[in-house]
């Protein structure tokens, strides 16, 4: 008969082992899902290209907006030429438009920088996945130790 402490220790050990088994099963499930989604490098490359294209499309839209804002700013600068000697005499509405334009330009630049970071994160995620997939693909190609190929196992049975 075990003491209360010993029973608690055994139960804790059993829980720990069960959690480890559950983690291992979850990891295997994730690996199977990954290899099912990406059966080869070409499939992985297609998915990477699609993810990068999404980021590039969003970036292109932001860059187009930045060009529009820059052109708008040039028009404001032409208007400001009339107040070159004393910019403080420029109408408040013009100064407000210039300030809003500058803020919009800065916002677009921050957004584009964020998209560049997102693109790096996407590449990094796919690089990590690819490293893991290479190991999994290699493991799929190599027979498990102790396992005999089906053709070898079937041959002796046919000769009996």
Residue locations for each model-derived region?
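Compositionally biased, proline/threonine/alanine/serine-rich low-complexity intrinsically disordered stretches
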Residues: 1-15, 127, 133-160
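Short, cationic interaction patches enriched in Lys/Arg with P/S/T/G and frequent prolines
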Residues: 1-46
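Surface-exposed, polar/charged faces of alpha-helical domains
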Residues: 36-135, 139-142, 146
